[in-house]
């Protein structure tokens, strides 16, 4: 597969990772800010929709943070999409075609485990320093490190955002054992089954949360990445700014509309990916901005692992501060600086 034929170039993928990590980092702190309405991520609550509509009808100084909370949960979907896209290019069309299933799963598990273990160590050091009298239970921590905590209903996950590690490992297993070099029709059938499962359970119930913290939520964006890598080899349609703007406008309207209804909410990853592709292709025309997102993309793994530690430091300020924007910017600044400092630690094999 020639490089120029790819829908998303290496640079565009890195920019998309940069966009995704900023959304993830912002989302995991923003909804703790006082007066900001929570968004629907794992469950669909009509109260959250009503809260956003109320803020839309009574715009005040906090509205930009409400808007951020409304759109920021999409970062995880982008990470999952890029995983599907990248794995397919490497292991079905690139240098990894001769990799055995055992080597594939072992290498990805160890990579996630080491990254997570370093993050947990940093988090625990801070947590025990700030709360020396608190008890840390080993059982939930071991389950989290082994990336099986998601499979246990109501099992505490420490730090909270690390639920992603267990979920993405489930995706890797299913991809390699079920989807790898097999018919895309089979993959679409499995995605349809997962959507039906989520559609028939209570939108705001515990089962919905359990399904979405595991494989079900990830299947649609991941398989979309696989399908794009397999079947959409050219992107001449998106070569002009006009077409990108049209795609961005249509997808953004559909994305926003889908967030207000439960069944369409399940299909959000499709429009999230479309919006993001249009955004990165438009930003590519501005070298200064694209270089920033490319840089953030290169730092995304460390940012993801480090940001829960910074969040823990500033949670009280988020809940009590009368200057929410100052706290949010302080959080983002501290997260980026700490990630830059610790990047060599996470780069070590």
Q: What would you call each of these model-derived segments?
A:
Residues 195-302, 306-331:
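Alpha-helical transmembrane segments and terminal signal-anchor/GPI-anchor hydrophobic tails
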Residues 1-194, 320-349:
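Membrane-cytosol interface segments of multi-pass membrane proteins
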């Amino acid at each position: 597969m020639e490089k120029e034929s790819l829908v998303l170039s290496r640079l565009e993928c890195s920019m998309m990772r940069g966009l995704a990590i900023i959304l993830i980092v912002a989302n995991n702190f923003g909804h703790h800010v006082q007066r900001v309405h929570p968004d629907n991520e794992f469950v669909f609550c009509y109260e959250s929709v009503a809260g956003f509509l109320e803020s839309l009808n009574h715009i005040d100084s906090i509205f930009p943070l409400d808007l951020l909370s409304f759109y920021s949960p999409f970062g995880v979907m982008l990470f999952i999409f890029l995983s599907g896209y990248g794995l397919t290019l490497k292991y079905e069309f690139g240098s990894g075609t001769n990799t055995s299933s055992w080597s594939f799963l072992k290498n990805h598990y160890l990579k996630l485990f080491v990254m997570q273990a370093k993050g947990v160590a940093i988090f625990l050091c801070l947590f025990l320093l700030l709360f020396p009298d608190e008890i840390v239970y080993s059982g939930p921590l071991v389950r989290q490190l082994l990336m099986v905590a998601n499979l246990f209903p109501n099992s505490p996950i420490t730090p909270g955002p690390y639920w992603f590690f267990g979920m993405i490992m489930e995706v890797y297993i299913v991809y390699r054992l079920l989807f790898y070099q097999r018919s895309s029709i089979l993959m679409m059938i499995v995605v349809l089954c997962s959507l039906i499962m989520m559609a028939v359970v209570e939108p705001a119930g515990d089962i919905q949360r359990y399904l979405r913290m595991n494989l079900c939520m990830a299947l649609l964006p991941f398989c979309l990445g696989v399908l794009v890598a397999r079947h959409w080899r050219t992107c001449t349609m998106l070569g002009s700014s006009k077409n990108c703007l049209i795609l961005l406008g249509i997808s953004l309207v559909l994305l926003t509309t889908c967030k207000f209804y439960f069944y369409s909410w399940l299909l959000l990853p499709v429009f999230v990916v479309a919006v993001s592709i249009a955004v990165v292709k438009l930003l590519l025309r501005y070298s200064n901005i694209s270089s920033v997102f490319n840089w953030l993309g290169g730092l995304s793994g460390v940012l993801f692992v480090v940001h829960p530690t910074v969040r823990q430091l500033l949670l009280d300020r988020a809940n009590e501060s009368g200057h929410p924007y100052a706290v949010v910017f302080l959080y983002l600044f501290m997260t980026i600086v700490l990630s830059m400092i610790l990047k060599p630690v996470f780069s070590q094999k």
